[in-house]
Regions:
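Hydrophobic helix-and-loop "lid/oligomerization" segment in the mid-to-C-terminal part
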Residues: 2, 8-132, 152-153, 204-441, ...
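Mid-to-C-terminal polyanion-binding domains and interfaces
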Residues: 69-70, 314-320, 324-360, 393, ...
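Alpha-helical scaffold elements adjacent to nucleotide-binding pockets in ATP/GTP-utilizing enzyme cores
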Residues: 91, 121, 148, 194-201, ...
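A short acidic, amphipathic alpha-helical/loop segment
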Residues: 144-148, 373, 480
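Short alpha-helical basic/polar micro-motif
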Residues: 193, 371, 375, 552
Length: 577
C-alpha cells in the first residue's frame, strides 16, 4: 500500500515570552504547544482558575446547603466511563467529608438504561428515596429525565461538560463551562473537574455560613481528591490546557507520594505501574482502560465502589475484577477487529474513492467496545469514523471518533437538522460523540455522513500525518534530557508528549514478541548508539535486512528494568530510506 503518512514539523511561536532560565529545548517545545508565558507553566493550586467564574455555582451551592441542613436524601447520578466514575466517587466523598450523611449514588447501566439521566434512571433514583438529584458528567441533554424528576417533585442540579444543545433542561441549576453565558476561561474541564469545582464552591459557602463551626467539623482538605480529578481528566482525553495541567499535575503528585485512594493504588498494582514514577500516560493507557472496562462490559458501579472503598484488601479484589474485565474487553475487541478485516480490505482497495467519513456496522459487534474500534479504524484510514452495534428493539448505538478539522458533534447536529428523524439522539464533543438510530436508517446515515464529511473537510486533512518537534542533536540524546522531558509534563491531549524525527543508520533489527521490532540505530551524522523499539509493526515489511538507513519519528525514553536505567527510543513511525 502506498505510504499515506506524511511528516510535518511543528511551528514554534517565536513571540512566546518564556523564562530565559528554561533549557532551550523546553522553550521550543512549550512555544510550539501554544504556551506564551510563564503563568501557563504554573503547577501550584494557586494558579487554578477560580470557581467564582463558573455560572450556576451560587444557585447550586445554595440548594445543596439547604439539602444538607434539612437532611434531604441526595442521589448522585453518574456516567459509565472513567470520567463519570471519578466524578461520582469524588462528589460522594466530598459531600460526606463536608458533613452530608444522607447521600448515595446511582450509575446508569450502559445496556439497560443508556446514557444520561433518562426517565427510567429517575425512577430508579426515586425508588431509592431521592429528594435531590445531582448529575455528574451528564445531564446537559437530559430534557425528558429532568422533566420526569420535576413531575415527581425531585429537583435536579446538572453538572456536566458536554456541549449543550439549543435548549437546556429545566433543572434547578446547571453548571457547565460550555454554557453560552459561562465566563469560565477554560472550556476543557472534564466532568470530574466540574464536580471538583462545585465542591470547592460548596466548601466555601458552608464555611461562610458557619456550618463547620456549628457542628464541630474540621474543614476538609479537598485537595486530597485531586488523584481522582487527575485520573478522570486524563482518561476522558480532554485537552490538557493550563488549568487542566495544574489539576493533573497536583493529582499525579499525590499519587506519586502514595497519598491516593486505595482503589487507585490497587489499579496501579494490577497494571504493574510504579506509583513513584507515574506518568500521565499511565493514567490514560493503564488505569483508565481498566476502569472503563466495567462500564463497557458490566456495570460501572464496580468501578465507583473501587474508588470509594477505604480498604486496600477490598480494593485489590475489585481491581482484579476490573483487570479481568479489561482482558475480556481486549479479546472482544480483537474479535471485532477480525470481523472488521473484511470491511477494511474492501476499503483498502477503494481508498482513492473512500468517503470523507466512515460509518460501519456489524450485527455481532459489542456496543461497549465500538468506541475503541472506531478509534482503531480512524487511525488506519485517517478520517472520522462511527462504528455501530445492535442495541435491541431494532436500534443501533454508534460511537464516533474524529480527526482535527471536523467537529463530530457539530456534524451530527447538522445531519439531524438536514434529515429530521434519521438520528434518534446524539451528544458529545469535537473529537468523540455517541448516537442512536433505527437499524433500517443505517445505510442512509452511512451515505449522508460520508457526504457531509467530504463536503466539510479539506482533502489534505484526510492524509495521515506525524507531527514532529524536529530533530534532536546528538548532545541532547541523553538520559538527562529524557528525564527532563519526563518531568516537563504532564503531557496529553492537545499538549502532546514530545516526538522527534531524524535520519539514522539501522545497525540491528529483530522481532520480539509477535509484532514488536527491536532495533539499534546511530544518527547518520554521528552520535550515540541507541536502543529502540517499535510496537505493532507490519511484519510483512519488518524486519528487512536490506534496509540500512531509516527516518524515525520517536520519543526519548528511559528503560527501567530490575533496578537498571538505560536510554532508549520509542519509535512511533519508521520509514526506510
Amino acid at each position: 500500500m502506498k505510504q499515506q503518512i506524511q511528516l510535518r514539523r511543528r511551528e514554534v511561536d517565536e513571540t512566546a515570552d518564556l523564562p530565559a532560565e528554561l533549557p532551550p529545548l523546553l522553550r521550543r517545545l512549550y512555544a510550539s504547544r501554544g504556551v506564551r508565558s510563564a503563568q501557563e507553566l504554573e503547577r501550584s493550586v494557586k494558579g487554578m482558575l477560580p470557581w467564582q467564574q463558573l455560572s450556576g455555582v451560587e444557585k447550586a451551592v445554595e440548594i445543596l446547603y439547604n439539602a444538607f441542613r434539612e437532611g434531604t436524601r441526595i442521589i448522585v447520578v453518574g456516567d459509565f466511563d472513567a470520567d463519570g466514575a471519578t466524578s461520582t466517587a469524588l462528589s460522594v466523598l466530598a459531600m460526606r467529608s463536608l458533613g452530608c450523611s444522607n447521600i448515595d449514588y446511582l450509575v446508569p447501566n450502559r445496556f439497560e438504561d443508556g446514557y444520561g439521566l433518562s426517565p427510567e434512571v429517575v425512577d430508579q433514583a426515586h425508588a431509592r428515596g431521592a429528594q435531590l438529584i445531582v448529575t455528574v458528567d451528564n445531564g446537559i441533554s437530559s430534557h425528558a429525565g429532568v422533566e420526569h424528576a420535576r413531575s415527581l417533585g425531585i429537583p435536579v442540579i446538572v453538572t456536566d461538560h458536554h456541549l449543550p444543545g439549543e435548549t437546556l433542561p429545566a433543572a434547578e441549576a446547571i453548571i457547565n463551562p460550555n454554557l453560552r453565558d459561562c465566563n469560565f476561561p477554560s472550556k476543557s474541564l472534564a466532568g470530574v473537574g466540574v464536580a471538583f469545582y462545585l465542591m470547592l464552591a460548596l466548601r466555601t459557602f458552608l464555611r461562610d455560613q458557619g456550618w463547620f463551626d456549628e457542628r464541630g467539623i474540621a474543614i476538609p482538605n479537598l485537595a486530597e481528591l485531586l488523584d481522582l480529578v487527575a485520573l478522570g481528566t486524563v482518561a476522558d482525553v480532554v485537552p490538557l490546557d493550563a488549568n487542566n495541567r495544574i489539576l493533573t499535575w497536583q493529582g499525579m503528585s499525590r499519587i506519586r507520594a502514595g497519598k491516593c485512594r486505595p482503589g487507585i493504588k490497587a489499579l496501579l498494582e494490577v497494571a504493574n505501574r510504579d506509583a513513584q514514577k507515574l506518568a500521565a500516560s499511565d493514567l490514560g493507557f493503564a488505569l483508565g482502560p481498566r476502569l472503563n472496562a466495567a462500564g463497557r462490559l458490566d456495570d460501572m458501579s464496580v468501578g465507583v465502589a473501587l474508588l470509594l472503598c477505604d480498604n486496600i484488601g477490598e480494593a485489590r479484589v475489585l481491581a482484579n475484577e476490573l483487570d479481568a474485565l479489561n482482558q475480556t474487553r481486549k479479546e472482544i475487541e480483537q474479535g471485532m477487529q477480525v470481523e472488521a478485516l473484511t470491511l477494511w480490505e474492501k476499503l483498502e482497495r477503494s481508498r482513492d474513492t473512500l468517503p470523507g467519513g466512515l460509518a460501519m456496522y456489524h450485527p455481532e459487534w459489542h456496543q461497549g467496545v465500538v468506541g475503541i474500534l472506531a478509534s482503531r479504524i480512524k487511525e488506519r484510514f485517517h478520517r472520522p469514523v462511527i462504528a455501530f452495534a445492535p442495541a435491541g428493539d431494532g436500534t443501533l448505538k454508534g460511537s464516533g471518533r474524529s480527526i482535527q478539522g471536523l467537529h463530530m458533534r457539530d456534524a451530527l447536529e447538522r445531519l439531524d437538522t438536514l434529515y429530521p428523524g434519521m438520528i434518534l439522539k446524539f451528544g458529545g464533543h469535537a473529537m468523540a460523540a455517541g448516537l442512536s438510530l433505527e437499524e433500517d436508517k443505517f445505510e442512509l446515515f452511512q451515505q449522508r455522513f460520508g457526504e457531509l464529511v467530504t463536503e466539510w473537510l479539506d482533502p489534505s486533512l484526510l492524509q495521515g500525518e506525524v507531527v514532529s518537534d524536529g530533530p534532536l542533536s546528538p548532545a541532547e540524546m541523553t538520559m538527562e534530557v529524557a528525564q527532563l522531558l519526563r518531568d516537563a509534563g504532564p503531557w496529553g491531549q492537545m499538549f502532546p508528549e514530545p516526538l522527534f524525527d531524524g535520519h539514522f543508520r539501522l545497525l540491528q533489527q529483530r522481532l520480539v514478541g509477535e509484532r514488536h521490532l527491536k532495533v539499534m540505530v546511530e544518527p547518520v551524522g554521528g552520535g550515540p548508539l541507541l536502543d529502540g523499539i517499535a510496537f505493532n509493526v507490519d511484519t510483512a515489511l519488518w524486519p528487512d535486512n536490506g534496509v540500512r538507513e531509516v527516518q524515525l519519528a520517536y520519543k526519548l525514553d528511559i528503560n527501567e528494568f530490575r533496578g537498571n536505567r538505560s536510554l532508549q527510543i520509542i519509535i512511533d513511525n519508521i520509514w526506510p530510506i
